[in-house]
Design a protein with these regions (language model features):
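Glycine-rich phosphate-binding loops of nucleotide-dependent enzymes
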Residues: 1-255
Length: 255
């Protein structure tokens, strides 16, 4: 079943075409990779899906609903979450508090909720879920550390945990393991994949670590100069001469 549909979507910044008539289908529960050289339009495409940037033509649908004209807050409420290439944490807050903010839209508010004790129950449940994510991403010992004081790779793990705390149906990850060591990247990706599968979350992942991408993604979409130039299984993409030439050059093989 298709969860997300993009139909001939184009994004321009002045005279520059960042995304050129891209069409894409994501099935519910799929893990899709999105690759391409710098400037290929990958982040611009994610920004278009989450309505951070406007699209000049085309349409975007989520669960069969046209979301092209929605604002970012409405996109989030529908169950579309994301991380950013450059981490955007609350730097003065603790790791625990940052992850807790991911659950804000699931809290129960209002006089009736307070009267029947539902607010307290919801907060207790949220805290339990946060502790579970802290443990899953090996962040328990850093729960009370100020997020802004942490190394970039650890901040990336906090960002991924916070995004999963939103309980999204679709999660867009923009270079999630940049700044991590190889072992950290392997662990973070495995954790994200396992949680996503357990919860039925669809993943769209932009990542330059080709070895990680080839191991993680079920299908891969390749962009070059704003266009989709190939789509297929990791094995198909790995052996596609056009992809190798466009993405890495004549002398390099995909991992």
């Amino acid at each position: 079943m298709t969860l997300l549909s993009l139909d001939v979507v184009s994004v321009r910044f002045g005279g520059i075409a960042a995304v050129r008539e891209v069409s894409l289908r994501l099935a519910r529960g799929e893990i899709r990779g999105l690759i391409g050289p710098n400037g290929a339009g990958k982040t611009s495409l994610i920004n278009a899906i989450t309505r951070v940037v406007d699209i000049q033509s085309g349409s975007i649908s989520f669960e069969g609903r046209d979301i092209t004209a929605l604002v970012p807050e409405s996109i989030c409420q529908l169950g579309i979450g994301r991380t950013f290439q450059h981490v955007e944490l609350f730097r003065e807050e603790t790791v625990f508090e940052n992850i807790l903010t991911g659950l804000y839209r699931h809290y129960v508010y209002g006089f009736g909720a307070a009267l029947f004790g539902l607010v307290g129950r919801a907060e207790e449940e949220a805290r339990r879920e946060c502790h579970g994510l802290l443990d899953a991403f090996a962040l328990t010992q850093l729960a009370h550390a100020r997020a802004g004081d942490l190394p970039f790779g650890i901040q990336k793990r906090v960002d991924m945990a916070r995004a999963l705390a939103m309980r999204p149906q679709l999660l867009l990850l923009d270079e999630p393991v940049s700044g991590m060591s190889e072992s950290e990247a392997n662990e973070a990706i495995a954790t994200t994949r396992n949680i996503a599968r357990d919860r039925g979350i669809t993943l769209l992942i932009v990542e330059h670590n080709m070895r990680v991408m080839m191991q993680l993604a079920e299908r891969i979409t390749v962009m070059h100069e704003g266009r989709v130039i190939a789509e297929g299984s990791p094995a198909e993409i790995r052996s596609d001469r056009g992809v190798i030439d466009a993405y890495l050059g004549e002398e390099t093989e995909l991992a």
